[in-house]
Amino acid sequence: MYDGPLQELIDALSRLPGIGPKGAQRIAFHILDAPAEEANELADALREVKEKAKFCKICFNVSSDEVCQYCRDPRRDQSMICVVEESKDVIAVERTRQFRGLYHVLGGAISPLDGKGPADLHIRELCQRLADETVTEVILATNPNLEGEATATYLSRLIAPMGVTVSRLASGLPVGGDLEYADEVTLGRAFEGRLHVGVGA
């Protein structure tokens, strides 16, 4: 344990996702050893993101404006919406360069253990977007875990009666992954999406 501000910084950093006590300590000492200008830039950036970052009023993606760059781009395919859990998932999909439609960010996934139900997500707003019949397909790109699967199942049952095609991203075993480390959802999806190989395939 360290005294005063240094320990307070370590404690604050360790509360961030993916950063343990040792990682927090390394970052804290880096900040301590850095020039004051660099530390001030970091502090300013943290302050700015909390004060100025917004969420798109249409799709709820993080945006610096009321409407995000994807929703206001007329070149995007208006007939398709890709539904994701978080804004970081939008970036992941964009990196594939396989999708040119619109997005809808739910703000999480259905998770009873975390006290998060459908009413806590941007599901009502998604249904409102589908009401004008411009959208013909919804791609459910929630994470391939139990919460993501539960959310996708809930949404598919909700959207299907609206006459919109609902599809789910294919998922399976990662390349280089070991079978024994695969969870039951991933392994089950791998079996469902199996390909025939060999003679006559």
Curated annotation (Swiss-Prot):
<comment type="similarity">
    <text>Belongs to the RecR family.</text>
</comment>
<dbReference type="InterPro" id="IPR000093">
    <property type="entry name" value="DNA_Rcmb_RecR"/>
</dbReference>
<feature type="zinc finger region" description="C4-type">
    <location>
        <begin position="56"/>
        <end position="71"/>
    </location>
</feature>
<keyword id="KW-0234">DNA repair</keyword>
<keyword id="KW-0233">DNA recombination</keyword>
<comment type="function">
    <text>May play a role in DNA repair. It seems to be involved in an RecBC-independent recombinational process of DNA repair. It may act with RecF and RecO.</text>
</comment>
<keyword id="KW-0227">DNA damage</keyword>
<dbReference type="InterPro" id="IPR015967">
    <property type="entry name" value="Rcmb_RecR_Znf"/>
</dbReference>
<keyword id="KW-0479">Metal-binding</keyword>
<dbReference type="Pfam" id="PF21176">
    <property type="entry name" value="RecR_HhH"/>
</dbReference>
<dbReference type="GO" id="GO:0006310">
    <property type="term" value="P:DNA recombination"/>
</dbReference>
<dbReference type="Pfam" id="PF02132">
    <property type="entry name" value="RecR_ZnF"/>
</dbReference>
<dbReference type="Pfam" id="PF21175">
    <property type="entry name" value="RecR_C"/>
</dbReference>
<dbReference type="GO" id="GO:0008270">
    <property type="term" value="F:zinc ion binding"/>
</dbReference>
<dbReference type="GO" id="GO:0003677">
    <property type="term" value="F:DNA binding"/>
</dbReference>
<dbReference type="GO" id="GO:0006281">
    <property type="term" value="P:DNA repair"/>
</dbReference>
<keyword id="KW-0863">Zinc-finger</keyword>
<dbReference type="InterPro" id="IPR006171">
    <property type="entry name" value="TOPRIM_dom"/>
</dbReference>
<feature type="domain" description="Toprim">
    <location>
        <begin position="79"/>
        <end position="174"/>
    </location>
</feature>
<keyword id="KW-0862">Zinc</keyword>
<dbReference type="Pfam" id="PF13662">
    <property type="entry name" value="Toprim_4"/>
</dbReference>
<protein>
    <recommendedName>
        <fullName>Recombination protein RecR</fullName>
    </recommendedName>
</protein>
<dbReference type="InterPro" id="IPR023627">
    <property type="entry name" value="Rcmb_RecR"/>
</dbReference>
<dbReference type="InterPro" id="IPR034137">
    <property type="entry name" value="TOPRIM_RecR"/>
</dbReference>
